[in-house]
């Protein structure tokens, strides 16, 4: 983002803490984590900006308020059933997932974002003080100490087709849907009761591959973010649309630039973000694949030089070296072990072949104990 702004001859300041000390004249703020949106809203007031209100920040930060907003704009049929339980009787039957109302699906702690096949299995795994904690709520310093609660939500089928758009709202409130991605998910079981279902492949797709219901619903959603919430100058990643058995549901919206935008920017010669900032029309003519390498689990005895492959390896991937334990990867940004391959290009069949070739060469470079 900073590089894009400076390429246009403008200046940018990056702040990671001490936000209350920010002074000066600015025309817009971009927040790279939704947990900081409340801070941005306060800074907007302080600096005399009108891109994000306090109430809009709350809707885009809190999953329960997000669901309530979607219901209010006519998308209620797409919102999964959920509850913030304060007693056992509040829970409902079926496959369930536990989410903090303020948090990220990549921040796993053994309980948050874990799924269960039944109410009984959830009850067998909840902390002793779960219901009492949920009565008063809790805060997490990783998410700017915003008040949060545990939300128990209907778990959507693991065989769903999952789609999500990247979009942005410009300074005049015009919505620009950029491109859509398709996410392939993988179910990881923990014992007999717990499981995760996270994406292991994220790839951009052509507009004619997107279901009409996803196009129509995303348009309603983005226009409402701009018109009802009054949001301006914001990148949006999501929501994720789950399509299954003739049903479509939507979850989660991340008001940030997102990895997909970063990859598309790189694929198109680092022109996307500058063109967005300059309000230029963009023709997206490239694609990306971001996929786990799915390396064989084990402990590395030795590894051959693979530096020539690093142009295809994500920046968040872990280094391979003697003694490194390769664990089963749960998602494309797993903090325990991550080795993900990124392929940029135009023709998808060629991109898939490149992915497979890089994966095989990487795997063949490893010798295990």
Placement of each model-derived feature along the sequence:
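Peripheral (often C-terminal) accessory segments that flank ATP-dependent C-N-forming ligase machineries
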Residues: 277-369
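A short, Lys/Arg-enriched amphipathic alpha-helix followed by its capping loop at the start of a domain
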Residues: 3-11
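Conserved metal-phosphate-binding beta-hairpin within the catalytic cores
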Residues: 222-260, 292-296
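Conserved N-proximal alpha/beta basic substrate-recognition cap immediately N-terminal to
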Residues: 16-91, 103-106, 337
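Phosphate-binding site of ATP-dependent enzymes
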Residues: 127-189, 209, 238-249
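Conserved ATP-binding module of the ATP-grasp superfamily
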Residues: 76-80, 113-159, 221-228, 368
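ATP-dependent carboxylate/phosphate-activation module, predominantly the ATP-grasp catalytic core
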Residues: 159-224, 254-281
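Conserved anion/nucleotide-ligand pocket segment
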Residues: 95-115
């Amino acid at each position: 983002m900073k590089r894009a702004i400076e390429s246009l001859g403008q200046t940018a300041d990056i702040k990671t803490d001490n936000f209350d000390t920010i002074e000066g004249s600015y025309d817009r703020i971009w927040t790279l984590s939704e947990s900081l949106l409340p801070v941005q809203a306060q800074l907007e007031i302080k600096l005399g900006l009108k891109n994000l209100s306090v109430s809009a920040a709350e809707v885009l930060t809190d999953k329960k308020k997000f669901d309530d907003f979607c219901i209010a704009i006519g998308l209620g049929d797409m919102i999964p059933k959920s509850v913030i339980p304060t007693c056992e009787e509040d829970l409902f039957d079926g496959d369930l997932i536990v989410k903090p109302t303020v948090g990220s699906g990549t921040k796993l702690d053994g309980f948050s974002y874990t799924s269960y096949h039944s109410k009984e299995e959830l009850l067998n795994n909840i902390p002793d003080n779960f219901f009492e904690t949920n009565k008063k709520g809790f805060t997490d310093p990783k998410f700017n100490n915003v008040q949060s609660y545990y939300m128990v939500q209907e778990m959507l089928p693991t065989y769903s087709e999952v789609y999500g758009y990247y979009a942005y709202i410009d300074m005049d409130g015009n919505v620009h849907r950029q491109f859509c991605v398709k996410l392939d998910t993988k179910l990881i079981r923990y014992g007999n009761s717990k499981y995760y279902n996270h994406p292991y492949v994220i790839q951009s797709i052509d507009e004619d591959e997107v279901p009409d219901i996803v196009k129509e619903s995303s348009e309603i959603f983005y226009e409402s973010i701009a018109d009802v919430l009054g949001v301006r100058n914001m990148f949006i990643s999501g929501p994720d649309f789950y399509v299954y058995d003739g049903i479509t549901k939507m979850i989660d919206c991340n008001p940030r630039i997102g990895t997909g935008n970063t990859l598309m920017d790189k694929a198109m010669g680092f022109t996307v973000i500058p063109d967005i900032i300059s309000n230029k029309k963009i023709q997206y003519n490239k694609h990306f694949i971001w996929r786990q390498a799915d390396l064989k689990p084990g402990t590395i005895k030795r590894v051959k030089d693979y530096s020539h492959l690093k142009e295809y390896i994500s920046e968040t991937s872990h280094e391979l070296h003697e003694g490194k334990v390769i664990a089963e990867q749960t998602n494309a940004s797993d903090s325990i072990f991550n080795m993900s391959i990124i392929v940029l290009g135009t023709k998808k069949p060629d991109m898939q072949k490149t992915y497979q070739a890089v994966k095989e060469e990487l795997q063949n470079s490893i010798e295990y104990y």
